[in-house]
C-alpha cells in the first residue's frame, strides 16, 4: 500500500492506494458506534456495496446507503435532494460520515452533500474509476451540473481520507478506463515532462491495466495534484492549470448533453484544441502537438471535435466557464510539454481557428 498526503494550511489527509483496500476493515478511520451513509449507484453497488458494508459493520458501525441513478445526467440538484431525504429519514446527525463509493459523479454529488448537510459532515472518498482515482476524488471540488453549464453549483470541501482500491478498475468498462487516461496524460502535459515521457513508454500497460504500472501512475497523479492543492486549495492561482482542455471539453459535454461523451473523452479533445491554439500563439512546437495527439490516440481517446458540433457552437458555452473574468475568456495553454500557463483574454478568432483545425473531416 502507498500513502500520499495532502498537506493543507490547517490540516492534512491521506490518500491510500493499494489492492484490496475496500475489504480490509483497517482501511476505514471509523470507530464502533459511528453512523455512516454510503452514496453509490447500482452499477458500483453490485460489485462493492456488500464488501464495504461488511467491512464497516465488522468495525461496529451503523451503516445506511442510498443509490443514485448512474450517469453524468444525474449529477443534479434532484440527486442532492434524494441524499438529503435519506439522511433525514434515517436521522443522521452532524456526527455522521458520508462515504462516496463510485466514480466522479458520485464523488461530486456526495461531496456537495457532505459540505452542506447540517453545515458540514465528515466525507470519505472511495473512487472506483480511474478518472476519479487520479483526479476528482482529490482536492475537495464538489458540484452538480446546471443545464446551462457543467459544475456550476458547488463548493470546495475536502475529504478526511481518500481510499483508492486499484482492484475496482478490473470491473470498469474499457471506455471508462480510457477516459481516465485523459486526466493522467493531462498531468504530464501541464506539470511533469518526465511523467509524460514515462507515459509514452508505458501507456499500453496502463490500457491493459497492468498492476505495477497502474499503481505508479495513480500515485504519481495523486502526488502532483496534492502538491498543487497544497499551494492553491481554492483555485486562485496554480490550481487553474489542472483545467487544461476543460473549457473546450465542458463545452462539448454541455452541447451534446451530459453523458453522451464521457468527461475524459471531452477533455482529450479539449487538450488537443488547447495544444493547437498554443502552437498558433507561438508556444508549443508542432512536434510536441503531434506527440500529445499520438499519446491520446494510443489511449483510444478522441482528438477531434464531435461531428455534430460546429466551431461556432463552442464559444457561447466557453464564455460561461468559471475561469472567465470580467467577460474575458481565460484558457489553460501549453508553453511546452510539462509547462502550462493561463492565457488571459485570448483572441476569439484564434480560438475558433484552433477548433476548426480539430474538426472532423471526411
From Swiss-Prot:
Its cofactor is Co(2+); Zn(2+); NAD(+). Catalyzes the conversion of 3-deoxy-D-arabino-heptulosonate 7-phosphate (DAHP) to dehydroquinate (DHQ). It catalyses: 7-phospho-2-dehydro-3-deoxy-D-arabino-heptonate = 3-dehydroquinate + phosphate. One of its GO terms (molecular function) is metal ion binding. CDD domains: DHQS. This is 3-dehydroquinate synthase. One of its GO terms (cellular component) is cytoplasm. Binds 1 divalent metal cation per subunit. Can use either Co(2+) or Zn(2+). Its EC number is 4.2.3.4. Its main location: cytoplasm. It comes from Haemophilus influenzae (strain 86-028NP). NAD(+) binds at residues 70-75, 104-108, 128-129, 141, 150, 168-171. The gene is aroB. It is found in: Cytoplasm. Belongs to the sugar phosphate cyclases superfamily. Dehydroquinate synthase family. Keywords: Amino-acid biosynthesis, Aromatic amino acid biosynthesis, Cobalt, Cytoplasm, Lyase, Metal-binding, NAD, Nucleotide-binding, Zinc.
Amino acid at each position: 500500500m502507498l500513502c500520499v498526503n495532502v498537506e493543507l494550511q490547517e490540516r492534512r489527509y491521506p490518500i491510500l492506494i493499494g489492492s484490496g483496500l475496500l475489504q480490509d476493515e483497517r482501511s476505514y478511520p471509523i470507530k464502533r458506534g459511528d453512523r455512516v451513509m454510503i452514496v453509490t449507484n447500482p452499477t458500483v453497488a453490485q460489485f462493492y456495496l456488500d464488501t464495504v458494508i461488511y467491512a464497516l459493520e465488522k468495525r461496529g458501525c451503523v451503516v445506511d446507503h442510498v443509490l443514485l441513478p448512474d450517469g453524468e445526467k444525474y449529477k443534479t440538484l434532484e440527486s442532492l435532494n434524494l441524499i438529503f431525504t435519506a439522511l433525514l429519514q434515517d436521522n443522521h446527525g452532524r456526527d455522521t460520515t458520508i462515504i462516496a463509493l463510485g466514480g466522479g459523479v458520485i464523488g461530486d454529488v456526495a461531496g456537495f452533500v457532505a459540505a452542506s448537510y447540517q453545515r458540514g459532515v465528515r466525507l470519505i472518498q472511495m473512487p472506483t474509476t480511474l478518472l476519479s482515482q487520479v483526479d476528482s476524488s482529490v482536492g475537495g471540488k464538489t458540484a452538480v451540473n446546471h443545464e446551462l453549464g457543467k459544475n456550476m453549483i458547488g463548493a470546495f470541501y475536502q475529504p478526511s481520507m481518500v481510499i483508492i482500491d486499484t482492484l475496482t478498475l478490473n470491473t470498469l468498462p474499457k471506455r471508462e478506463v480510457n477516459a481516465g487516461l485523459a486526466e493522467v496524460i493531462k498531468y504530464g502535459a501541464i506539470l511533469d515532462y518526465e511523467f509524460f515521457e514515462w507515459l509514452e513508454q508505458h501507456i499500453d500497460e496502463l490500457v491493459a491495466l497492468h498492476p505495477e504500472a497502474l499503481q505508479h501512475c495513480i500515485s504519481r497523479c495523486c502526488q502532483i495534484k496534492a502538491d498543487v492543492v497544497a499551494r492553491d486549495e481554492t483555485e486562485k492561482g496554480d490550481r487553474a492549470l489542472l483545467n487544461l482542455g476543460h473549457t473546450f471539453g465542458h463545452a462539448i459535454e454541455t452541447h451534446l448533453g451530459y453523458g453522451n461523451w464521457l468527461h475524459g473523452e471531452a477533455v482529450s479533445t479539449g487538450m488537443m484544441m488547447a495544444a493547437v491554439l498554443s502552437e498558433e500563439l507561438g508556444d508549443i512546437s508542432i512536434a510536441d502537438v503531434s506527440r500529445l495527439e499520438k499519446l491520446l490516440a494510443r489511449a483510444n481517446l478522441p482528438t477531434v471535435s464531435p461531428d455534430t458540433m460546429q466551431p461556432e457552437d463552442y464559444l457561447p458555452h466557453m464564455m460561461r466557464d468559471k475561469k472567465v473574468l470580467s467577460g474575458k475568456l481565460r484558457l489553460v495553454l501549453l508553453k511546452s510539454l510539462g509547462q502550462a500557463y493561463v492565457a488571459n483574454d485570448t483572441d476569439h478568432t484564434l480560438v475558433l481557428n484552433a477548433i476548426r483545425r480539430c474538426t472532423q473531416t471526411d
